[in-house]
């Protein structure tokens, strides 16, 4: 029956994990969570009008050397030529995760010398730490070392580092 099939598919989608680039898993999860879809009141035109809200950030400009890092990095792979990596300023990186109530090991962006320009597709909370860098959110200055609420569609623009240091998070 339809309800049983939908529940099985929801369960399968919840348990599916694919590492790497963006997939359509989140899209499918949102379709299967839609009340009209679950009620069976949709037609074949449903997907053409379905509003998908991606949980993503668009990189409008990458900055000089922006990378995704985590803590403590990739340890134990020197034997196959992979250095430990991880955030250069582990303290600032971990502090940002703590302010955001993230696990210490949660991934984040490391910006080197000059920052990126990012558009947020979903409401979120961010925190900037590390070397002080020019930063504005929709044209308004952003403070470092504190959490900042970000609305969907907002643009975070980060410029050059001001003062000591080369890495911001």
What is each stretch, according to the model?
Residues 1-56:
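Catalytic cores of soluble metabolic enzymes centered on carboxylation/carboxyl-transfer
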Residues 54-169:
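Conserved "landmark" site that anchors the functional core of diverse proteins
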